């Protein structure tokens, strides 16, 4: 039954690349088979509840621009009735888009209670409402998470807070969110440390806070196993914003943290394009490194404005970048429990309800184009064959012996002298490889 928010709009369908209908897919055909799998099963699209339904359109210089029927009126109180209206519209949008998944924070979906118990009870109540909507629509939960960064209690961190009561409150909040995620058959649970870091070292015990973060994550992993949650625990790296320096800076930093606390086999990473850019990396770099380290899990797909210097969370539209990102994902074997979550929001001037649909349609089409280009590159060995040739020397008997530890430094030095080895540089052929990529996109 329609909420009326989107007007008289039918389910978005695939119309092909020649379509000029803004409310149709041009490249995303969910049933199209690419590399042996349906596009829907490759991409596993999810809609982010927070940007689409909770964000009011504000920025640091101005307040709310969006007028949504589920927002409390000026001076009004947020209620469970409004939360359920929001859910009605959300699931209507998921269905219109044909999006198989959604993601949420606890604070996105229920109003804050007068205390922890009331907040948890409200989360349970909306979870029951979600369960009915999920059964009705077939939409599934990709992941749940706790908002441990917006409320003022978390201004100095959650797991890394100097006050142990805040640590305890955060732990209780995460427990309630994991419980709900499990009840809704969520396939992952995400931890993002927006306030886990510091503004100045003058008031920060960095060593202590690292230990607190390690203990917190260990508690989460222990609880996952205790309750039989089969989903994947994911950490989402980000270098800064809102905190000046965040401890989950990038893939390499998080992997070192996981190794330190013996959790590298228990936790994987949810990697966001915009966060990679903030850390000074490309999206494909972070994906390739996570794959190399065995911790790739899921992605938040969006894009940043390259000139602004902050996390703009725009809908993705750079197909060449996305093709290289999905190439790394296919090289990792594709998504297991993860997927493509649109951690993207409208521009604050995009006021119309249809803008929500159009933003996601464009993002889904761009992802489909990127995935299909990546799949063709994999099938044709367009990049893997030159890469294998570049490193072919390591497949020689001597190359394998050096790498396996069968040669000492003295052995290697003696061979260089005896064989009169004088290596000659070889072209990296970067321009050729870039041109090859352009043939596919």
UniProtKB/Swiss-Prot annotation:
Cofactor-binding details, from the entry: Binds 2 magnesium ions per subunit.
Keyword Isomerase: yes
Cofactors: Mg(2+)
GO cellular component: cytoplasm
Subcellular location: Cytoplasm
Catalytic activity: alpha-D-xylose = alpha-D-xylulofuranose
Gene Ontology biological-process entries: D-xylose metabolic process
A GO molecular function held by the record: xylose isomerase activity
Protein name per UniProt: Xylose isomerase
Species annotation: Mesorhizobium japonicum (strain LMG 29417 / CECT 9101 / MAFF 303099) (Mesorhizobium loti (strain MAFF 303099))
Top-level taxonomy: Bacteria, Pseudomonadati, Pseudomonadota, Alphaproteobacteria, Hyphomicrobiales
Gene that this sequence comes from: xylA
């Amino acid at each position: 039954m329609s909420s009326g928010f989107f007007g008289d709009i039918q389910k978005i369908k695939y119309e092909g690349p020649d379509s000029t209908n803004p409310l149709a897919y041009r490249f995303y055909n969910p049933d199209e088979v690419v590399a042996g799998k349906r596009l829907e099963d490759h991409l596993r699209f999810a809609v982010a509840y927070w940007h689409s339904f909770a964000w009011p359109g504000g920025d640091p210089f101005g307040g709310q621009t969006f007028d949504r029927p589920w927002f409390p009126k000026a001076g009004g109180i947020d209620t469970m009735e409004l939360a359920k209206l929001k859910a009605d519209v959300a699931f209507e949008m998921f269905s219109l888009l044909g999006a198989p998944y959604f993601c949420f924070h606890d604070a996105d979906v229920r109003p804050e209670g007068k205390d922890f118990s009331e907040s948890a009870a409200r989360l349970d109540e909306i979870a029951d409402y979600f369960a009915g909507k999920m059964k009705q629509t077939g939409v599934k939960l990709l992941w749940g998470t706790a908002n441990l960064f917006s409320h003022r209690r978390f201004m100095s961190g959650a797991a890394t807070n100097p006050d142990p009561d805040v640590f305890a409150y955060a732990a209780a909040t995460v427990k309630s969110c994991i419980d709900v995620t499990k009840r809704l058959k969520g396939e992952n649970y995400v931890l993002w440390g927006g306030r886990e870091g510091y503004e100045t070292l003058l008031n920060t015990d960095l060593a202590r806070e690292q230990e607190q973060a390690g203990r917190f994550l260990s508690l989460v992993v222990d609880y996952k196993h205790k309750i039989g949650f089969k989903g994947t625990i994911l950490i989402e790296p980000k270098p800064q914003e809102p905190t000046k320096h965040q401890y989950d800076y990038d893939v390499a930093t998080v992997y070192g943290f996981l190794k330190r606390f013996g959790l590298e086999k228990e936790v994987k990473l949810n990697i966001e394009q915009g966060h990679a850019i903030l850390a000074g990396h490309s999206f494909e770099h972070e994906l390739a490194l996570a794959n190399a380290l065995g911790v790739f899990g899921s992605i938040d797909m969006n894009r940043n404005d390259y000139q602004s210097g902050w996390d703009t969370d725009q809908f993705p539209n750079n197909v060449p970048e996305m093709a290289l990102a999905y190439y790394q994902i296919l090289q990792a074997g594709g998504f297991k429990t993860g997927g493509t979550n649109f951690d993207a929001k409208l521009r604050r001037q995009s006021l119309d309800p249809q803008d929500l649909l159009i933003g996601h349609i464009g993002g889904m089409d761009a992802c489909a184009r990127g995935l299909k280009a990546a799949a063709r590159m994999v099938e044709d060995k367009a990049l893997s064959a030159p890469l294998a040739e570049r490193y072919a020397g390591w497949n020689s008997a001597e190359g394998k012996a050096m790498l396996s530890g069968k040669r000492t430094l003295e052995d290697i030095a003696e061979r260089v002298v005896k064989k009169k080895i004088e290596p000659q540089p070889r072209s990296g052929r970067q321009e050729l490889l870039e041109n090859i990529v352009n043939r596919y996109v």
